[in-house]
Amino acid sequence: MTDSKYDLLFLCTGNSARSILGEYLLRKMAPLRFNAYSAGANPSGKVNPLVQRVLEEKFLINTDGARSKSWMEFKGFHFDFVITVCDHAKESCPIWPGQPIIAHWSSPDPAEFKGTDEEKIHQIYEVGLQIRRRIELLLSLPIEKMEKLKIEEHVSQIAFENQIASLH
């Protein structure tokens, strides 16, 4: 891997919640190291307003400009990393040019959360914390000094939080 900024795409089905969380958290956590993007296989057309509230109120991240978009907008783009955050996106993930590192970080779907808005906000926040922890682990990897196969192995293992200690 190079010393330049890495391009990372988070994918989920609707691009309304989990992939948006990943994109905006990574933008905040590593703006000098990564360009963060998100997209969906079948975009919902809007970002979940509770996800925006969580990002703004709990993580203190400005979400102006957040939008649900298709992965077709990125057709031909050469990503360094593609991370799917839902099982459907993993199954239908297209072939990306440039042989990016691909990993699957499955997370609960906020669209399926039940309860009041406040209960849903708490559940979405928990998903955000899970994604943030995985991003922290990604950022702790010495990517610039690792071979591609090792990077892919470690980035994939991040999804299994009980194996965190084995990453270093």
Label each PLM-derived region with a short phrase.
Residues M1-H168:
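Short polar/charged helix/loop
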